[in-house]
A protein has these predicted regions:
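Beta-lactamase-like hydrolase cores
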Residues: 1-13
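Short acidic/glycine-enriched loop/turn segments that link adjacent beta-strands
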Residues: 3, 26, 87-88
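Charge-rich, well-structured scaffold segments of protease-associated domains
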Residues: 10, 15, 21, 66-216
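Active/ligand-binding-proximal structured segments within catalytic/core domains
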Residues: 14, 22-73
């Protein structure tokens, strides 16, 4: 493995930044890690709040529609994806190096300014219901859920990340928005950028994007 030359620092609002220059290929990966997952859903434990929020964060912000977000990523030749786990939700955009700052802009916008449009929420509710149905038809997934439910009878690990369908069906868009505002805050976020980038440019961009975002 190449030597680890990553630099890490923390902004005044508590957000962590990790950046590493790597010139081995003309690409970059821009990631946002939020320290929130299925075990941090408090009174909504088992509802899959973190998972549906993962689906919703690129469905529109205060300044961009879902189509505009998708078009911006396409324009720079990027690939966007995300996943939810027990204790984290991770979003990433892989781009040619020229698109790194654009990817940062879009990710920061989604982390801080998502609007979770009700019409998009209704669509994603159905998408996730289909995920539930597919999971029920998957013996490996069923076995994993049963294993965790047996091994962690009191700990939140006993519940699947996607949630339980009966609790999930009770969720409202307003509850998801409240969770988003509470958990997606600078002091709960880590931005990671690795690739053929200029560290000073990335740092300046991130500091400017989050300079008006206070810790909560």
């Amino acid at each position: 493995f190449p030597p680890n030359t990553a630099q890490r620092w923390t902004l005044a609002n508590g957000m962590t930044l990790i950046v590493q220059e790597d010139r081995s290929a003309p690409v970059a990966s821009v990631q946002a890690w939020c320290a929130t997952g299925s075990t941090t859903e408090d009174k909504h434990l088992g509802a899959g709040l973190s998972h549906i929020l993962e689906h919703m964060l690129f469905k529109g912000t205060k300044t961009r529609s879902t189509n505009e977000i998708a078009q911006k990523i396409q324009d720079v030749g990027g690939y966007i994806n995300a996943y939810t786990s027990f204790d984290r939700t991770v979003f990433w955009i892989d781009v040619p190096k020229e698109g790194a700052l654009t990817a940062l802009d879009i990710l920061a916008d989604a982390m801080m300014n998502s609007t979770l449009p009700p019409q998009e929420y209704a669509k994603e509710q159905e998408v996730i219901r289909r995920e539930f149905a597919m999971g029920m038809d998957d013996p490996d997934r069923t076995m994993t859920h049963l294993l965790f439910a047996t091994a962690y009878q009191r700990h939140p690990y006993r519940l699947p990340v996607i949630g339980l369908i009966d609790i999930y069906n009770q969720l409202t868009q307003e509850q998801v928005m409240e969770y988003y505002k509470r958990r997606y805050v600078p002091n709960n976020l880590t931005f990671i950028v690795v690739g053929d980038i200029v560290l000073a440019e990335v740092r300046e961009k991130l500091e400017n994007l989050f300079k008006d975002q206070p810790a909560k």
